[in-house]
Amino acid sequence: MSEFPRKAKCVVIGAGIVGNCLVGHLAKLGWTDIVQIDKGPLPNPGGSTGHASNFIFPTDHNKEMALLTLASQRQYIEMGMNNTCGGIEVARNPERLEEFNRRMTSAKSWGIEASLLSPAEVKELVPFINEKIILGGFYTPSVSCVDSLQTGTLMREGAVKSGNLNVFANTEVLDLEVEDGEIKAVVTNKGRIEAEYVVVACGVWSPRIAKMAGANIPLTPAVHQMADVGPIDILQKSNAEVAYPIVRDMDTFCYERQTAGSMEVGSYAHRAIFIHPNDIPSNEASALSPTELPLTQDDFDPQMEQAIELMEMLGDAEIKYAINGLLSLTPDAMPVLGETVEVRNLWSAAAVWIKEGPGIAQLVAEWMTYGYPHLCDPHSSDISRFYPHEKTEHHIYARCDEHFNKTYGIVHPREQWASQRDMRRSPFYPREQAAGATFFDARGWERPQWFASNAKLVEKYKEACQPREHEWDARWWSPITNAEHLAMRESVGMVDLTAFNEFDFTGPDAMKFLQYMCVNNVDVEVGRSVYTPLLTPGGGFRGDLTILRLDTDHFRVVTGAFDGGRDNYWFRRHMPTHGSVVFTDMSSALCTIGVWGPNAEKTMAKIVTGEHKIFDLSQINFPYGAVRNVLIDGVPCTMFRISYVGENGWEIYTKMEHGLRLWDSIAAAGKEFEIIPVGMGVYAVTGRIEKGYR
């Protein structure tokens, strides 16, 4: 064994599937002087990888996760660690059959072979299934079982053989040292290692390790119950590790997977059970391993009964092994990847399951090497997506409790969270609530999607509102949205845009910095704006936003609620360090109203004044893309002539404390034109379609 090092280019903490594959990919990309440590023994240090069910169902409605899963499966195949056995998801009710039709669409979109089966066809592939209680199945021939421990071992050993990696098991992290906001060293029970980069890839322990550096990885260890049931005669006679397709009993949130002569039964139907990272036992104190806790039998019994109903032979066998296995859950059920927001060069590769482990390791390695990954766009997994309130334990537990039992659930793409609501309200909230707003969540903001007060407009426009006949299409939707669209197109509407994020850049190098960050030329006249993409280091598209030039050395970036965290991090990460550019997040200080429609100008002309005189709002004096500081009924505001909804109008910014006065003033001025509040269903969907920005 090598002598414990005092310096390294990169320290990877964790030797599960992610950490092992990561060191392998880093070595392949030319990284040298890598050190990998884990507090447990090798090859199984005691994390979730050691007890995982090790199967891959590639179809996912989320493109990012589907691509990462397919990339992982390719790597398992290349290493000879993939056993293709096929998989069938079975339906017990008509709603699930409808979901299978939607899954067929996703499978075709990602190039995954799949087919719908009748109960009899399911029986042909899985002869011991009770076909009388199912209505059909979703069959994916490429579903496979993998050996994640051996895969990780091969990747780790390959990096060692290349001469680029030193590995130290039974090495516990005691502290992470940070200097001037940048990671400096890892302190272990074997010594201190100075490091340029540190990656936290230690699964359920990741939050505890990150907090040593003052960083936050928002996840919780959660229980997933599983049991090995056997011996079972028909499985023993197959003389194979996996001879039959894996079955996912979707409506009971269970799965059945052959393991030689036994059947592994796993469940996501029990209550959500969380373990704090600090309460996970050590290897020495664990009967099996730190992440294999004793089964809570009462939670598992109902699920076992349902499994026996589907496969009667399970009732004649014994439970040989059963655990409350720990895995990682995040508030939005997505991985947590990328450089931490709080500490430079401290990276997260956490909340990753076996099916996407090697692919995510490749993605993170590329990200660290090139500044952005080549494999796929990691927007949904980027750690910088989280706002501060979303990283609290209260939020993490509430959201994870809500979505745990939806692991195999039928989740509508517009379905809203029930927990952790009313975290962020605009000053217009009382008026919106009085108007019967249906609120959707936008990173904690309560945003009106449509208003019950506009229901009468549905009758006015009748069939033009295009009612949706299919129940699924009509979920989390209302014809009021289309009525609001038509009303704004005829007259005028006002939209709450307070969920926008606004970042001010000031200082002598503000313009130079933004020129570097943005594609389009930001050196426009004061009082003008620029709509521009942000690119990755390789020239890929990272995002788009608007920049207002408020003064010679004062620019305001405006971006959306769902991109604000990522854009905030991206700008701050690339800012000069000598103080020539000052970044100020104005998002909690400003509120925004959009006013659009043919009568928007007439409405605002009643109440907008300049410096003690009537202000000319005409297109000649106030052209598209122009920015002006004005008074609106005495309220200091910034008006920006812009439209993403196909109608003339403005975004209007003011301080939060002036917001309610501004709303009431605009509503009163527009009463003559029957002004209405308009929801995000118009602004974010139908209006944008009509505008057709290209």
Where do the protein language model's features map onto the residues?
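Dinucleotide-binding Rossmann-like beta1-alpha1 core, especially the glycine-rich loop
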Residues: 52-125, 251-256, 260-264, 274, ...
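Central helical "cap/lid" subdomain
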Residues: 188-243, 375, 659, 677
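Glycine-rich FAD pyrophosphate-binding loop
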Residues: 27-49
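C-terminal catalytic lobe of FAD-dependent flavoproteins
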Residues: 251, 260, 275-277, 282, ...
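N-terminal Rossmann-like FAD-binding beta1-loop-alpha1 element of flavoenzymes
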Residues: 8-35
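Glycine/proline-enriched, intrinsically flexible loops and inter-domain linkers
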Residues: 376, 386-694
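Central beta-strand plus flanking loop segment that forms part of the substrate or channel wall
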Residues: 51-58, 89, 213-241, 501-504, ...
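Helical element adjacent to the flavin cofactor pocket in flavoenzyme catalytic cores
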Residues: 138-197
